[in-house]
Regions:
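Amphipathic alpha-helical hairpins
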Residues: 1-144
Length: 144
């Protein structure tokens, strides 16, 4: 059971990190404020690093990882595109990122609870990704 919980939790963590990168990519080019841009770029890098660490653990278990659901990616891209056309790109970007972080924290926390027998390494990396999402949401609040 421990190995299955570990594998499942890592897959969800992988999908979450990829979704975070994609969400940041979806708004980054429209951000005008340099501080906000830098903040998002740093978080994107951190999401990539966590995703890479997750993939290393998945590879060691013989797994190729998990892509975010196509429907979720498509809906997020559509929402980003529509919101970014509404004006004040920095405020819209902060709003989208805040929403995305909230969804990420909720789903990753749910998976952490759902797979309690996952190895400590898998739980740790999931908690780190949750922490990154919480930190990013807090950091973009001044731009809302």
């Amino acid at each position: 059971m421990e190995n299955q919980d570990t594998l499942r939790l890592l897959r969800e963590c992988d999908a979450g990190a990829k979704m975070g990168v994609a969400s940041i990519d979806g708004v980054l080019e429209n951000v005008k404020n340099q501080e906000l841009h830098d903040l998002l770029a740093q978080s994107r890098k951190r999401h990539e690093q966590l995703g890479n660490r997750t993939m290393e653990l998945l590879s060691a278990l013989g797994d190729a990882g998990k892509e975010p659901p196509a429907m979720a990616k498509g809906m997020a891209a559509m929402k980003s595109g529509m919101k970014m056309m509404m004006g004040n790109s920095d405020q819209q970007a902060a709003d989208l990122i805040t929403d995305g972080c909230g969804m990420g924290v909720n789903s990753l926390s749910r998976y952490l609870n759902q797979y309690p027998n996952a190895q400590p390494q898998a739980q740790k990396i999931t908690r780190e990704l949750i922490g990154e999402e919480e930190s990013l949401a807090k950091s973009v609040r001044p731009y809302l």
